[in-house]
Amino acid sequence: LGKLSELTDLGVEVHFFTGNHDLWCGDYLTKECGVMIHREPLTTEIFGKEFYLAHGDGLGDPDKKFKMLRAMFRSRTLQTLFSALHPRWSMELGLNWAKHSRLKRIDGKEPAYMGENNEYLVLYTKEYLKSHPNINYFIYGHRHIELDLMLSSTARILILGDWINYFSYAVFDGENLFLENFVEGETKL
């Protein structure tokens, strides 16, 4: 958190897109570190290119149970009720919930890329692109897979992978966008 504060103190904008594990993050990062929190997708122009940036959680996912659960987690009423619980109980509940979620995946890994016609973030993006053809780059996290896919002659989707297993991130140099992987001792920042 100190490094985030150092960056924002230097005038670097730091944006954080909340996802399925961050729904209740509150305003701590904003108040203490100067981080801009985004709970919804953001469309922005950078060096003449149009970007659609989002965590990816809930975008195009057809699972009705997931949608209902997500709506419950985003409910201010339920958040208020949960915050009234003693931390001993709320932490226990949260940790058990996370453990149960991890155990659903026997190997502990995110499902592999399901293909262009089955990957729900790709399907969502293709549909969104029909009504927003000016967007050049769609960048997501959430799926924990690395993907760089051309959707048209002017539009691409990138799914970033993650910072725990792949150490992956996107770089835009003003002209080109590409995925990189941080390698300690080799990657120049």
Regions found by a protein language model. Give the residues of each.
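N-terminal short leaders/motifs
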Residues: 1-6, 104-135
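Short, solvent-exposed aromatic-acidic interface loops
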Residues: 181-188
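Short amphipathic alpha-helical patches
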Residues: 27-31, 92, 96, 105-108, ...
